[in-house]
Amino acid sequence: MRILPEPRGSVPCLLLLVSVLLSATLSLARVVEVVGYAESKIKTPHAFSGLRVTIDCKVNKGHFVTKGSGNIDDKGKFGLNIPHDIVSDNGALKEECYAQLHSAAGTPCPAHDGLESTKIVFLSKSGDKHILGLKQNLKFSPEICVSKFFWPMPKLPPFKGFDHPFPLPPPLELPPFLKKPCPPKYSPPVEVPPPVPVYEPPPKKEIPPPVPVYDPPPKKEVPPPVPVYKPPPKVELPPPIPKKPCPPKPPKIEHPPPVPVYKPPPKIEKPPPVPVYKPPPKIEHPPPVPVHKLPKKPCPPKKVDPPPVPVHKPPTKKPCPPKKVDPPPVPVHKPPPKIVIPPPKIEHPPPVPVYKPPPKIEHPPIYIPPIVKKPCPPPVPIYKPPVVIPKKPCPPPVPVYKPPVVVIPKKPCPPLPQLPPLPKFPPLPPKYIHHPKFGKWPPLPPHP
């Protein structure tokens, strides 16, 4: 961000209202507002179109990082989204941040009152809402900070026959230029050394995983089948002998049942839990052999006397209805209790003990004084005479005779073909074209 000098004759200044909302993506939501004002004499909304504002924060080593940007509307307002990392809990800014205006072309606009005028500072705090603002009013020059261009592009030429009153000369057609081909160049072959072999380690053989060993499941001991006991055969009894009617019994007075008195159950203080001791292994005994008893022989039927001849007498009392004789109860045979055989115990190996290294005992450092050695005396120099080794003279170099170089004469090249004479060009038009309406005015340049 550079500070440019204010140009002469500039008309600065537009009213800007900066409103920056912080996104509450974290658990601690905050709202940051930056409010700034600017002075201006121009109230047209066209001066704001295309302008853009960015919030640049200064990081280490003097570099600026853009934290947010937004466009300005017709009223001079804009909204920005900035991260909440630059604002602390007490509202102070962790970094130095500045507001920067950009023109419609994207170039930054110069600051008129220096960089400190666009600095964002802390103003106030209301609850979770932090209000920030600018030190001074923002100013910009419409001549330097240009907005969008609203005038339409001019139509050129304005009417037919305005640009070229005379036809253009025909294009020049030059004959083709043929260049004599040069003989090919032969160069001696270059001996390239063989590439250095790259030795790679042999690939590691993949060892297949070990084959799992599956042990057969332990066989469960099935208890012997439970014997089925059949009930004894029913014996048909003779018809009952009618008895004399009994006098009616007095009716029983049924009293209502007494009202039960419910007392709260007494609190039972549970003793401490008894440690569970594993019982010793049970010795399995074979089941007892059932003893079957032979059924008794049925008794012979008793002789039934014929019924006596009834003597009809006038009834004195109404006879009682005969009592119903209930059949004998059916015996309920309960199956013998099942013998539950506990599953076989699986003896697990004892756990592998984990040996931890003994804790290190830190002893205080022991100061050992340095050992000072006595300096040795310098050695006595021994002077020896230099040994002279005579060198043999080198023989003269053997002359190498090379054959003379044979010069091959070259044929002279044929003369170059002469180009045909250039055609005569038409005379150039005058410098200023005479026009009946505008007179001798210079021609207008074409519009880009």
Swiss-Prot record:
Principal localisation: secreted
Signal peptide: 1-29
Sequence ranges of the Sequence repeats: 152-156, 157-161, 165-169, 170-174, 175-179, 183-187, 188-193, 194-198, 201-205, 208-212, 216-220, 222-226, 227-231, 232-236, 238-242, 245-249, 250-254, 256-259, 260-264, 265-270, 271-278, 279-284, 286-294, 295-299, 300-304, 306-311, 314-320, 321-327, 328-334, 335-341, 342-348, 349-356, 357-363, 364-368, 369-374, 378-384, 385-389, 390-394, 395-402, 403-407, 409-413, 414-419, 420-424, 425-429, 430-434, 442-446
Keyword presence, Translocase: no
Region listing for Disordered, in residue ranges: 240-345
Region feature 46 X 5 AA approximate repeats, mapped onto this chain: 152-446
Subcellular location: Secreted, Cell wall
Cellular component annotations (GO), alphabetically ordered: extracellular region
Tissue spec: Mostly expressed in aerial organs, particularly in expanding leaves, stems, flowers, and siliques. Also present in stipules.
Keywords: Cell wall, Repeat, Secreted, Signal
Domain of life: Eukaryota
Compositional bias of kind Pro residues: 240-290, 306-319, 327-345
Family: Belongs to the plant proline-rich protein superfamily.
PANTHER family with a match to the protein in the record: OS10G0148100 PROTEIN, OS10G0149400 PROTEIN
Protein name listed in UniProt: Proline-rich protein 4
Lineage: Eukaryota, Viridiplantae, Streptophyta, Embryophyta, Tracheophyta
